[in-house]
């Protein structure tokens, strides 16, 4: 069985209805899945939307006092009964008929975790995509994957075994850090590192809906300040975890942490007050020991970026590049 965990906060009815409809349309038998909806104390409860699906599927609704998405997901994990877990944000959806083939691949190959593709969408239609029967993939450890690929900091593109969260070989269960943005970055990095058998399939499964006013697109000064503070919090927590790994293989984990520092710098370069934001970010990253960026050839892009950060003219070039790309 797979547990679909859906988080909501002040969503329009049609968005949540579209999300839940896409889960029901996966072609799974009723006893093969459950839907756990957690609402973060919306102004208007989504119960009437959830009740529309009560006769079709095993679905439950939980209400929490406004604690943000990390706490909502943790609450859902406490109630999850499935062998597998799939997160879906309430304003996103899954392309029809994609999850069942993924489950077959994951179980046939004894995977701990399966990563898949996504597509940005900007309308209200559930599009269909062609599902290939013979998907190609390579199996590796999570750490080896992160050593050779950039890991997207979103847990919604990861279908994983629930037992991976509470594996007895680790000191504590894996849960989301609560009360912050970008909680996905920490959770996804630790989760993928735990996977001994994982695969990445490029097939598009997840529809990532772009809407004005979402937390990832908010541009208020207060939100931007908090976002940068949260990046530092996540980096601190990942570095602390890294220091506890000892002899465990974690070269890929280290690469992910270093590239997350690059993300902070790139975001700094996109800001209107980019020079001040850059200096503040450098100060914070230096105090954590992740700046200057290490001279490691993770990729050509990383090496070029690192080289350009070392002089004022290089930073101006990077600012121009990031500003140009951000307009697209």
Feature locations, PLM:
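A conserved acidic beta->alpha catalytic loop
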Residues: 39-48
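A short, glycine-/small-residue-rich helix N-cap motif at loop->alpha-helix starts
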Residues: 64-73, 77, 180-181
